[in-house]
């Protein structure tokens, strides 16, 4: 088996590594994590401009159609740099779910806005009583005309404070 990266993957890896080395030093990270937002919106916009926010989203949903390898390369560099921007929450978790299971309307409004760096997403899935059992769900959603009424509690919603939209 050949585990070498192709030319495009190597370019992505180099680009993200260079960004972290040049623009994400420890002092910058500390300043961002201590800000009201908890991360840098300017960085989020750079990530969008560089195409990183759409790299793993299918072309049909407005992304670049990359694979898990491209996402892994970005996540690895972000891990090394202790990046605080909500890439995992907005792009990998919520974006991946919308890409695979969202309606065309959700993809065109929510997912494309997230890829453009204009929206932050959060997934509200954990419940206080469930601990690590994701099938222990008490929260209920009931149809009410064209909308739904949700009753229940969610806990530890990563990126909740800065999210524009939630997936429950």
Task: Identify what each model region corresponds to.
Residues 117-125:
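A short, Trp-centered hydrophobic/proline-enriched beta-strand micro-motif
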Residues 1-8:
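Intrinsic disorder at enzyme termini
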Residues 139-142:
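A structural signal for short hydrophobic beta-strand segments in well-ordered beta-sheet cores
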Residues 9, 20, 51, 58, ...:
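Buried hydrophobic positions in well-ordered alpha/beta secondary-structure cores of metabolic enzymes
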Residues 49-108, 112-117, 159-163:
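Internal helix-loop-helix
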Residues 2, 13-17, 42, 69, ...:
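Glycine-rich phosphate/cofactor-binding loops in nucleotide/flavin-utilizing enzymes
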Residues 27-49:
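Short secondary-structure junction/hinge motifs that connect adjacent elements
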Residues 147, 151-168:
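A short core secondary-structure module
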């Amino acid at each position: 088996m050949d585990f070498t990266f192709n030319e495009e993957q190597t370019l992505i890896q180099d680009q993200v590594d260079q960004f972290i080395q040049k623009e994400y030093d420890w002092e910058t990270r500390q300043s961002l994590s201590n800000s009201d937002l908890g991360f840098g919106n300017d960085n989020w916009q750079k990530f969008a401009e560089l195409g990183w926010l759409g790299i793993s989203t299918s072309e049909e949903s407005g992304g670049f159609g990359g694979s898990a390898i491209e996402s892994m390369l970005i996540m690895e560099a972000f891990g090394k740099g202790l990046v605080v921007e909500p890439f995992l929450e907005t792009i990998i978790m919520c974006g991946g779910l919308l890409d695979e299971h969202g309606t065309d309307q959700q993809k065109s409004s929510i997912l494309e806005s997230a890829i453009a760096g204009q929206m932050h997403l959060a997934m509200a899935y954990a419940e206080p009583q469930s601990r690590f059992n994701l099938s222990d769900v008490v929260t209920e959603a009931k149809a009410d005309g064209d909308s739904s009424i949700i009753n229940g509690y969610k806990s530890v919603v990563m990126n909740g404070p800065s999210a524009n939209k939630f997936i429950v």
